[in-house]
Amino acid sequence: MKIEGLHVAIVYPVLGLGGLDVVIRDTGKLFASMGIHVHYYTIEWREAEWQLPAPTHCSLTLLPDGAELWNQQAVDFVLQELRLRQISVLIIPNYFPGPYLDLLRSSGVKLVFWSHGMPLWEYHDSIEARRFVVKKKLSRHLEWIFLRVPFKLWTGAYRRSWEDYYRRVIEGMDLYLTLCPAYARELAEQLCLPPEQASKVVPLINTLQIEPQPTLEKEKLIVFVGRLNYADKRVDRVIDIWARAHKALPDWRVEIYGAGPDEQRVKAYLEQKGLPRIRFCGYTAEPSEVYRRASVLLLTSTHEGWPMVLIEAQNHGVVPMAFACSSGVRTILGEDNRAGVLIRPFSLSQYARQLVKLCRDTDYRAKLQQGCLSKRLEYSPERSREAWEEIFQRL
């Protein structure tokens, strides 16, 4: 497939300041530098947060009123646009078109599914969300323990339903992009993919612009930056970890940045605990200013795909800590802890001990900071360019 002059469409429901939104924007900028025309289609464009990356090579079109990802109205509109703009490749980040797949395939356009989660993340997310809900009501809790868990989890039926879903997605696409080589291997093994299907699964690491002169002299500041959502992010763990560590770190403080559905609960829990030197700061449109001041970043998620917050922290010389909850997290921080601190899932006591060690030991922290500055070079946009060139050549 000839790359220069190629027309590519990317369909995604909301374009704003989310991690994936930023990746999609930066990818458009990269494509434009390769001579590719990019056509974005979305339901909601948050114009103040998300700017068109390269107006000479990029366009943005809102889907018609009433359109959803995916329904018949959206599919009909996208098919019309594919023909009108002579689009050759349709990239679908995360939202599988389900029953409309055959219609999209009938257009003759190459279909690329771009996954931004670890394998079977939906399964793990729904289990965590369900656990949170049932805690609120005794009868639901008992039902969960004695009925739903044995039937769905012990028999594996629920997990198998998600495995079947993944097989359908991979089979229906020309290529399936995943976040790192380890995920490609995990999908092939967990789904028992035949060779012709396994060959469709291609790793594509998300990259970012390298910070030319990161600030290395930092404040005694620990931060959390991210979406406030219970099922995956578990920001309450940040508070519990600080409850264990704050007495040993009297000259350090914690700031929590973010917004989301769990915001009020996080605020209430923070007030309930009454801990010193920890505060909720809300949403920030300038995370780079936070990273400029911070020494340590905490990630306390139950599951993660390729958390951009970790590589953003490394890019600014902030030492990240995270539970070793996925291959993506382990790849970013390094199995040898050379570019961050991995914690056994989900030990709060170990997390607190390692946090105290990191904050107290200046030499140790400086060594990890240098490891972060070396590791971040693996995320340079040049590597992404090479990967995309190979992807287009395969289509």
Language model segments and positions:
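Active-site proximal beta-strand in glycosyltransferases
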Residues: R105-R148
